[in-house]
Amino acid sequence: TLLASSAASDVYKRQLLENGDVVSSQDFTSKNQQEVKDGELLTGLLGEKEKFAPGKKYKEELSVQNSGNIDTFVRVILTKSWQDKEGKKNTTLSPDLIELNFLTANGWVVADQQTTDERTVLYYTKAVKAGDTTPALSDTLRIDPKIATEVEKTVKDKTITYTYKYNGYTFHIDAEVDAVQTHNAKDAIKSAWGVDVNVSDDETTMSLQ
């Protein structure tokens, strides 16, 4: 999923990339015209006839491309969940077992105060020029192997049954990508995201307060 917050005119175009491929995109113009193309993450996680293995690391490189005509700062909100066959979230199952390895030595930072077990908020601290793509904010995904130890015991008519808690559930990751202009970025970010930041005089870098 790719959503947007825009705080200025001109043309905002950003794309969410997964392992180099466009998953979602959104175009926004000063005339309040929007074109949104939503996609789904993790659909290409497994190879043909490959079975998923808890504990194994799978390639999951997420990045953002600025395909608009103005420079922007971007943030990404990732939400992890377990869902049943009908797509209903089960909030009693732990999103912590869905592990993305975040890369924070390349300009991305995790906003700890805005992050929960279910939701991770990341900011790219450098301006993304028109036409450029950020470095990957993550590189791998794995499911904690202790998922196999999560069992429920039931007793009926002297018969004991053990059932894996996560049977019948699939894991999901939703990504929301937001962008604001670099011009007057401090005020634009506060207005659009409600976040206080420091912005360099040349408006090429920012940091959380």
What is the predicted role of each segment?
Residues T1-A8, Y12:
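Single conserved hydrophobic/aromatic residue that forms the stacking wall/gate
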Residues L42-K51:
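N-terminal post-signal-peptidase region of extra-cytosolic proteins
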Residues E50-W82, V128-Q209:
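C-terminal, structured domain-capping segment
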